Amino acid sequence: MKKLAISIGDINSIGLEILVRSHEELSKICTPFYFIHESLLNKALKLLNLKLFNAKIVAFKDDKDYEFNFIKKENSLEIYSFCLPLGFKVDENFEIQAGEIDAKSGLYGFLSFKAASYFVYEKHAHALLTLPIHKKAWEDAGLKYKGHTDALRDFFKKNAIMMLGCKELFVGLFSEHIPLAKVSKKITFKNLSIFLKDFYKETHFKKMGLLGFNPHAGDYGVIGGEEEKIMEKAIAFVNAFLHSKKDEKFFKKALKDENLQKELLLNFKGKGVYLPYPLVADTAFTKAGLKNCNRLVAMYHDLALAPLKALYFDKSINVSLNLPIIRVSVDHGTAFDKAYKNAKINTKSYFEAAKFAINLNSKA
């Protein structure tokens, strides 16, 4: 069975309970490695009044060299160590504060995630599955990242793309955790063309639509529309480029050369993978809209995620594209209000994320 590296997220959240309650069923479809120290795991299990059997846990440690070793088998747990350059000393000796924002839990969750990311990068596992973190806890810990995807960009120096959804509807986010005031400035021909090219090459979806930025997609310039003009130009260029089968070197050159862009467009007569005009966002998520196109790109976070979560909250997952590793995540937050309360916990997104990762081919 394929191996999954699973980072525990914020230990003060529902993540650890999802992990424990799902372990037996998850182990039927993959071999999970949980990135948590035994002492901290035992504290969480005691608070939850749960037990974890036949599991593999990985204690991670900051070191200048990468090294993965089996340590011991104890109380039906297989305990491993993974040393790597983390940039921080790992402190697992802190108290769990259920449902609270805490810098120590924030830093520990980040280091669990970083260690699990490089565990996959070093080919010890097929994919990474991340449990939810709290962005404020990361900030309080002195971390500069706004979330997992932001950190992955820095780890691997790649333009990671966030995609969320399920088989009924997937949405790629052109921008993620940035203020709305900054989104319009980010929408440039160059930025959007690169994004659309990369998004297609990662997904190979056959038909995709861009959600308009302005109400009614600008309504022919009556309600703004400047962003939609840029979107139309980028769509036409990327459709023509993908059809041409030209290489990356040509793409970079054509981004700056309007004559090459015109040449591509003159030679392009077919139907592109992207619909030619931005879609009106307020009807794109209706039954008829999704029947027409259920693979979408949104210029900003809430434009896509509000309707996605209203329609498919329980089964949606988060996928990071355009990286040297496979990374998936649950599509929900820390749910501090339910943490360590034996509340009803929905594990469907967790299983959907695991199954999605298992079914993907390994990154070269």
Curated annotation (Swiss-Prot):
Residues engaged in binding substrate: 148-149, 309, 318, 327
Catalyzed reactions per annotation: 4-(phosphooxy)-L-threonine + NAD(+) = 3-amino-2-oxopropyl phosphate + CO2 + NADH
Cofactor (UniProt): Zn(2+); Mg(2+); Co(2+)
Name of this chain's protein: 4-hydroxythreonine-4-phosphate dehydrogenase
Physiological role: Catalyzes the NAD(P)-dependent oxidation of 4-(phosphooxy)-L-threonine (HTP) into 2-amino-3-oxo-4-(phosphooxy)butyric acid which spontaneously decarboxylates to form 3-amino-2-oxopropyl phosphate (AHAP).
Pfam families cross-referenced by the UniProt entry: PdxA (PF04166)
GO-annotated molecular function: 4-hydroxythreonine-4-phosphate dehydrogenase activity; cobalt ion binding; magnesium ion binding; NAD binding; zinc ion binding
Keyword Cell membrane: no
UniProt organism field: Campylobacter jejuni subsp. jejuni serotype O:23/36 (strain 81-176)
